[in-house]
């Protein structure tokens, strides 16, 4: 990220979408190395209680998180020293799948919310108003980021921003209203009671099926939600 930033065209603004599999499963390195896997002692996390059946996976996942913490801290430290205004948004899309083997308290819709609920942070190297936006859907994160950067929204993102006032969370299986109520729906069914949601689904259908597959990633709501949002300057 730093290398791409330093090689950018400084005559114009730059945008970088960086996807990493750093902490993605499976978490089974020890199973292929006789119970051992290489990790620096300062990053090694050991689970001493619980997680009996998946303890190795839990330890690997948590140890990987310590690497991510250090890397993100280094990234923030670097950009905090840059003169150009910079905004960074960091988010994950779901928690580890092995938690389903040990978590039996939740099921159905509530389990989906908890397993797909992840925190996110929007940080800038200049002052931002601190705010916790609560639950929002992954598809709502892009317009929120653009608004934070004071970048004009396209008609599509304007539609998403308007929809988020009433339907802050929208996934492939359900949506959550601003009242906190949930509704389960199928993509084959058109919600008659919410005109903004109907407009969004029409918009989505146009972008996906009429504009071509290259628009797919821009428009389809992903089954991920943020459990908590945090603005920090």
Model-identified regions with their sequence ranges:
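Solvent-exposed soluble domains appended to multi-pass membrane proteins
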Residues: 1-233
